[in-house]
């Protein structure tokens, strides 16, 4: 078991930024696919870009911009982009910094995670206005006498048909799942038991009434949405399980196993820890048993993951490799690589037109305060 302080330190970077990674000597075999830029267009739009969503109903891409940090920080906002040109059509101002997003397209709602404020901002995608803030928890006074939030946020998933929003709350003292009623915009449950570590991954199977999370104790934890409690917990071979994609037609979970040297160094300082896999892969699991079905090599620093089940395609952002890699989700063979340097972060798909959208973070060499990009990949 890793010490709590180790996990908190190792996970601090992505707890704030929704992204992390460090260069690694381990890389995927690129024999089956070469890097391509011909299908990629990109546009710098704002500082501090994070997650994004495509709305078929509004025919728009919505992207969260935190504005960054420090004296050069810009405004926090959600940007509505033209899906063909990536031009900013509308800037929706927010009171709090924007990081994660999830879209309930049928109900014209975009839910935006305010990571550092442990809250969610609700945006009306039809009117392009913020319509509310859900405070998930209040600050508590610590041993130092200062008031602070005990949990921060990362991923959000929504069950629009049942009026429920699920949000992971990170803490080395015990991560939780917040449950929000999307009609009243009230927290109706806070489910403990996600592990005494950061819990970066989150996926919903509304039909099966299950939420799946991952944590940095190398676990996948299943929560029942009806029972409101942890139903299953599996130890997995992924030492740094990050984002999760769920196969809606089968029993599979796809989990990015990042292989960050930064996290590994912290893990190595923990009593009894011995690294057994370099990561840099997607782990395929049977979500009913936790059994490992496959291990798919990726480029360096895999983070975001998206499954297009209809076309049998799996897409992964490789944050340190500067690429998005595509795989056949049945054979697990790599079929394409798209160069999107410096740090591709999050993914969204226009399933009808078969177009992928990617947020791209700046690297250390870019000027401080420079705008970050959204890439459009015609698949």
Stretches with model-predicted labels:
Residues 11-21:
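Bacterial N-terminal signal peptides
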Residues 2-5, 19-379:
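Predominantly soluble domains enriched in secretory-pathway, periplasmic, or organellar proteins
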């Amino acid at each position: 078991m890793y010490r709590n302080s180790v996990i908190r330190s190792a996970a601090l970077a992505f707890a704030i930024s929704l992204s992390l990674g460090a260069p690694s000597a381990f890389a995927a075999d690129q024999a089956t696919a070469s890097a391509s830029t011909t299908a990629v267009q990109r546009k710098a739009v704002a500082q501090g870009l994070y997650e994004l969503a495509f709305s078929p109903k509004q025919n728009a891409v919505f992207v969260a911009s935190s504005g960054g940090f420090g004296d050069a920080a810009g405004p926090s906002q959600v940007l509505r982009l033209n899906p063909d040109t990536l031009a900013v059509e509308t800037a929706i101002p927010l009171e709090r910094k924007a990081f994660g997003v999830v879209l309930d397209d049928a109900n014209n709602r975009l839910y935006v995670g305010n990571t550092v404020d442990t809250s969610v901002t609700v945006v009306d995608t039809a009117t392009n206005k913020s319509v509310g803030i859900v405070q998930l928890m209040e600050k508590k006074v610590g041993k130092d006498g200062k008031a602070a939030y005990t949990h921060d946020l990362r991923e959000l998933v929504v069950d629009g048909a049942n009026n429920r929003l699920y949000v992971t709350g990170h803490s080395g003292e015990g991560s939780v799942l917040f449950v929000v009623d999307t009609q009243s915009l009230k927290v109706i449950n806070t489910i403990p038991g996600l592990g005494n570590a950061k819990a970066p991954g989150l996926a919903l199977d509304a039909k099966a009434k299950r939420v799946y999370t991952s944590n940095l104790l190398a676990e996948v934890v299943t929560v029942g949405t009806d029972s409101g409690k942890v139903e299953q917990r599996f130890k997995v071979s992924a030492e740094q399980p990050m984002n999760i994609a769920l196969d809606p037609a089968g029993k599979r979970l796809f989990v990015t196993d990042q292989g960050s040297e930064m996290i590994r160094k912290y893990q190595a300082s923990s009593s009894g820890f011995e690294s057994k896999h370099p990561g840099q892969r997607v782990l395929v699991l049977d979500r009913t048993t936790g059994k490992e079905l496959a291990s798919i090599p990726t480029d360096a620093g895999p983070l975001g993951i998206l499954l297009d089940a209809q076309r049998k395609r799996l897409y992964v952002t490789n944050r340190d490799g500067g690429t998005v890699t595509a795989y056949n989700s049945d054979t697990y063979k790599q079929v394409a690589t798209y160069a999107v340097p410096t740090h591709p972060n999050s993914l969204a798909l226009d399933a009808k037109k078969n177009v992928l959208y990617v947020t791209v973070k700046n690297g250390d060499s870019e000027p401080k305060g420079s705008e970050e990009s959204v890439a459009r990949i015609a698949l």
